[in-house]
Structure formats: structure tokens, C-alpha cells
From Swiss-Prot:
Species of provenance: Streptococcus thermophilus (strain ATCC BAA-250 / LMG 18311)
Catalytic activity: guanosine(37) in tRNA + S-adenosyl-L-methionine = N(1)-methylguanosine(37) in tRNA + S-adenosyl-L-homocysteine + H(+)
Protein name in the entry: tRNA (guanine-N(1)-)-methyltransferase
Family membership: Belongs to the RNA methyltransferase TrmD family.
EC category: transferase
UniProt gene name: trmD
GO cellular component: cytosol
Enzyme Commission number, as recorded: 2.1.1.228
Keywords: Cytoplasm, Methyltransferase, S-adenosyl-L-methionine, Transferase, tRNA processing
Subunit structure: Homodimer.
GO MF, one example: tRNA (guanine(37)-N1)-methyltransferase activity
Length: 239
């Protein structure tokens, strides 16, 4: 995968050079480039200006973004604009983006964008119903969530399939050694070696956590008969 990020603050992306994204680069699975679009700004390197018609704040001008984009070595990329008004990012969206060969991120700043910038864009993405100072933190989040889903990045494909949301449910609790720590014990079933019971316990815990914390995720979930039965048992506990 090739990723190009248009930003006023390339240094903010230094953390991406570590951990999973850094390993993907080292393996040659990922190429990631940062482009400061101020370098392509006309008018004394000004990247923003006042909005026509008046209003608060400054808008990013179209010219620096377009000229920077024109210099990218891309063929048919998904072009992502980070915008609070965009489609909300989630695990399914990350899985969709992980199938792409080229991604371009446009990170805004100031009050907003000249609307004409959006003619370059295929996706407008938001992390949620809140506003950040710029698009850089959102871009880093999306890159990290997406890159870890690329085959061979994590080493084992199953490494992410049990993540919360990958299955459509929240992840079950997990434990490691010691079996007892400060009076807190690992559930006996996990120490039993009985794989059928362990699988059912994990299923029950995952369904329970989802029901208690994110019941909205269950609305479109494709239940097995066993899962449906377990969920009904969980619901009946509160009656």
C-alpha cells in the first residue's frame, strides 16, 4: 500500500514511524510520504484566506492543495478529506480501506476548506461528533487502524480477527500469568483446558459486554443459533 498525506505539520506524524506502521514500512509492505502543502503555496506561502461573504475564521485555499496533489505519483487513489461532517470511521471502514493500493489524506486546519478542494476527494471521514484543531490526529488514527489489517502486517491474520468490532461484537476479557494476582483470579474455565467450554465462555462474555455497552451493534449482527440462545439467557438475567 502507498499512502500520501498532505499536511501543514509533517513532524506530527513521527509516531507512525514506530510500532505496526513502522514495521510495515520496514517489511516493504507500506510506503508512506508526507507533503507540506505550504511548500506549494503562492502569495508568500499563505495557505489560508478569509471566506467570501464574511464569517469567522480562515479557510484553506484550494491552490496549495491542488498543486501538491498534482505532484503526487498516484494513479487511482482513494482521496480522504478529514472533516467532522464526514462519514463516521469504524472497523468496517478500516477493513474497506485496507483493500486499497493507494490512499491520499488531506489534513485541514483553521476553520475549514475552500469547497472546491472537495472535487479531489472520494471520501470525507470523521472520527465522531467532535472537532479537532486539525486533521492530523484523525489521519494517524485511520492510518494505524487500516495498516494493521493489511495481510502480513501483523504476521498472523487471526491477530486482528478477535479484536473488538472485527467480529461485529466487543472483545471478550483476556488474562495472562499469574493465575492469581492481588487476590484477583483468572476464571477457572480458562485454566481448564476444555476448549469447547472456553469457546462458549468467550462467546458469552463478548455478547454480554456488547449488550451492556454497545447494544446498537447487535441490531444488524448475524447471530448463530447458539449466540442467540446465549443472548436471550443474558437478557433474562435482568428480568
Amino acid at each position: 500500500m502507498k499512502i500520501d498525506i498532505l499536511t501543514l505539520f509533517p513532524d506530527m506524524f513521527a509516531p507512525l514511524e514506530h510500532s505496526i506502521v513502522g514495521k510495515a514500512k520496514d517489511k516493504g509492505i507500506l510506503e508512506i510520504n508526507y507533503h507540506n502543502f505550504r511548500d506549494n503555496a503562492e502569495k508568500a506561502r499563505h495557505v489560508d484566506d478569509e471566506p467570501y461573504g464574511g464569517g469567522q475564521g480562515m479557510l484553506l485555499r484550494a491552490q496549495p492543495i491542488f498543486d501538491t496533489f498534482d505532484k503526487l505519483n498516484v494513479t487511482k487513489p482513494r482521496v480522504i478529506l478529514l472533516d467532522p461532517a464526514g462519514r463516521t470511521f469504524n472497523q468496517a471502514y478500516a477493513e474497506e480501506l485496507a483493500q486499497e493500493e493507494e490512499l491520499v489524506f488531506i489534513c485541514g486546519h483553521y476553520e475549514g476548506y475552500d469547497e472546491r478542494i472537495k472535487t479531489l476527494v472520494t471520501d470525507e471521514i470523521s472520527l465522531g461528533d467532535f472537532v479537532l484543531t486539525g486533521g492530523e490526529l484523525a489521519a494517524m488514527t485511520i492510518v494505524d487502524a487500516t495498516v494493521r489489517l493489511i495481510p502480513e502486517v501483523l504476521g498472523k491474520e487471526a491477530s486482528h480477527k478477535d479484536d473488538s468490532f472485527s467480529s461485529g461484537l466487543l472483545e471478550f476479557p483476556q488474562y495472562t500469568r499469574p493465575a492469581e494476582f492481588r487476590g484477583m483470579k483468572v476464571p477457572d474455565v480458562l485454566l481448564s483446558g476444555h476448549h469447547v467450554n472456553i469457546r462458549r465462555w468467550r462467546m458469552e462474555q463478548s455478547l454480554r459486554k456488547t449488550w451492556e455497552r454497545r447494544p446498537d451493534l447487535l441490531e444488524n449482527y448475524d447471530f448463530t443459533d447458539e449466540e442467540r440462545q446465549i443472548l436471550e439467557e443474558i437478557k433474562s438475567e435482568g428480568k
